[in-house]
C-alpha cells in the first residue's frame, strides 16, 4: 500500500513529467496486466490501456487507450496560464469524482448525510486476479484464466469513508477492456449514490466523431454519426428498459475513419435498464465519454456496510475502422457473453403464428398452421400471443396478461395435447425428425382484466395515488419484489413442465411509467436478471428469444441469457436492411431474429419479391417465417422449401463467421459478406434496392479474404483473394429490386 498526500499538495505533483517503462511482450494471460509501481498497463493483441497514480495525491490519471505501445511512456504535460493554479479539471482522469475543481461530468456523485456531494476517492492498493470474477446479480462477460485477466484498483475517501473498487478485465484476443465499479459505504451514516458510470474515458486533445443508434418502434437501430462538439452531448433511456429510442452503445472515432480503415473505440454497456451515455469535450479539448446507470433513475441509498455494483461496460479498440470494432464485439459476445448452449449452434427455421393468425385461432386452426409449416420444411412452430387466460381469456390485448394458464376455450383438450399433436409432425415429411414447439410469454406484464391483478393490484408498479397509465392496455409488474419474481418463475416453469416446449419467446411491450422511487428501475432489472438466470439455468435445452415490441431491449444484458432477440416488429425487407446493419454495429448477427413475412407487408404495405425478403432475413442468426402458408400464392409457396434449404446452408457461417459491411444500408446496392472462422468459406448478400435506367453495373469489392488464396465463386469462376478485394465482381439484376446470395470456397 502506498500513502499519499491530501489534495492540498496536489499542485506539486501535477506538473511532473512522469515516465515509467511498459514491457513490450506479446499479450498473454501472464503479461496482459503489467504493473510497474503504480502504473498499470493492460495489453491486448493490438491494444494497450494505460493509466497511473499521481505520486502526490493518489488520483488516477489516464495515459493511453489505443494501439499497443512499449517502452517508456510520457504522461501529459499540463499547461499553466498566467500563474493560475492548475486543477484536476485540466487533466485526463480515470474515474472522475465530484468536486475539487473538475467541472466536467463526473463518473460518480455521492450525496453524504450532511448533504455534501464532494468526493476524494484516492488510490489505496490494487489486486491482479487470473480470470474474471462474476458480477453479483448482473450479467457479465466471462472467461477462463487463459482468456482474461482482471485488475482491481481500490480507491478510498477518508472523509466520507466510501470505498470504490475499479475492475478492469482484459480479453487480449479481442482487444477488449471490460470495466465496472463496486461502491461500498464503510462509514456510520447513510449515503446516496446519485450518479454512477461504469466507465469513463478521457481522450486526448483532438477532433473526434461519435456514432450511436437511435430509433423508435419498428425503426430501431438507425445509426447516426456526428462531430463531437465542445460542451456536452449524449443520449439515454429513462423507460426502465434499454428501449427503441436509443441503444446502450457508443463509438468514438477519428473524423477520417471509415467502415474499413481508421481508429475506432467501441463502448457497449452490459445492461437492459435505464442508462445514460454522455460525451463532453471540455475547454482543454479533451473528450470524456461515460456510460452507466441513468442518474435520473438512481438515487440509490447505501446504508453502512452496503455496496452498489455497477453494470459492466465493454470497451474495444480497432485500427480497422468501424467494421473492425464491430467484429471484435461480435466475437467477444458470441464466445464470452452469451451463456446459452445455442450461442453458436445452428438455429431451427421457425414459423411464428402472429402475422398469420393474430388472436384469431383455436386448436384446429393452430394444428392446421403447424401442419402447413411442417410440409414446407419448417423445424419449429411457435404459437404467439393469445393461448392463455381462463376467467379473463386472452382473445384481444386487453385481458389475460398475468394469468399463465392455457385458455380452455381455445384448447378444450388441453395445451399439452395440442403440443403432442404438433410435435408428432415431421418437417418436410422426414420421419427421422419431429417438429418442435415454442410458446410466447410476456411475464413482466399484467392486464387490469386478469385474475392476478384482482388478487394483487399492489404488484403492479405505481406511484402512490397517481393514476396507473396503461400502454397496450397493460401495466408493469414490480419485478423488484421477490414474491413477483417467484410468481413469474413458477408460472413459466409450470407451463414448460407441462409439455414438450423447446422454445420461448419472452416479450415486453411497454416501458415503466410510475414508480415508488427512482431506484426502482435498477431494482426492477436486478429482479428481472434473477428471473432470467433462474429459468435459463433450469431449462438449458430451451431456446430462449428476447423481444420488446421488436428490438426495444436488444442489449448485452439480455444476450447473457437469451442467445437471440427479435430485431424489430418491422418485417419489411428494405426497412430491415437498415435495422439489421445498424444493429450489427454492436451485436453479432447470430443474435438477430429475422423472418420472411407476407406481402403486402403489414407494417409498410410494400410488396417485394420473396427471394429478396428471404435473403434479407437470412442475414440473421434465427431465420423464420411470419405468415400463413395457406394465404401464399402458389409460386411463392413452392419457393419456400428451397429458400429454407438455402437458409440452413448459410446459417452456420452467419452464426460463427466475421461480418463485413461492404456497402452501407443507404446505398442503392447494400452488401454484406460473412467469412467462416477458418476462412475456408464465405457468403455474400448483395441487394439492389431501386431501379436505374441505362446505368453502369457497379463492382462489389470483398474484404477479409486471403489475398494469396484462390476462391471459387458459386463453384464456377475462380479468382484470387486479391482480385476479389481490389477489383471486385459485378452482378446484374433483372428487376428493379433484386438480391443475390453468392458462395465463395477457398481452393
Swiss-Prot record:
Its main location: secreted. GO terms for cellular component: extracellular region. Keywords: Carbohydrate metabolism, Glycoprotein, Glycosidase, Hydrolase, Magnesium, NAD, Polysaccharide degradation, Secreted, Signal. Disulfide bonds: none annotated. It catalyses: Hydrolysis of terminal, non-reducing alpha-D-galactose residues in alpha-D-galactosides, including galactose oligosaccharides, galactomannans and galactolipids. The active site is at residues 507, 569. Residues 1-24 form the signal peptide. Coiled coil: none annotated. GO terms for molecular function: alpha-galactosidase activity. It comes from the Eukaryota. Its cofactor is Mg(2+); NAD(+). InterPro entries: Aldolase_TIM, Alpga-gal_N_sf, Alpha-glycosidase_related, Glyco_hydro_36, Glyco_hydro_36_C, Glyco_hydro_36_N, Glyco_hydro_b, Glycoside_hydrolase_SF. Its EC number is 3.2.1.22. GO terms for biological process: polysaccharide catabolic process. It is found in: Secreted. Homotetramer. Belongs to the glycosyl hydrolase 36 family. Hydrolyzes a variety of simple alpha-D-galactoside as well as more complex molecules such as oligosaccharides and polysaccharides. This is Probable alpha-galactosidase C. It comes from Aspergillus terreus (strain NIH 2624 / FGSC A1156).
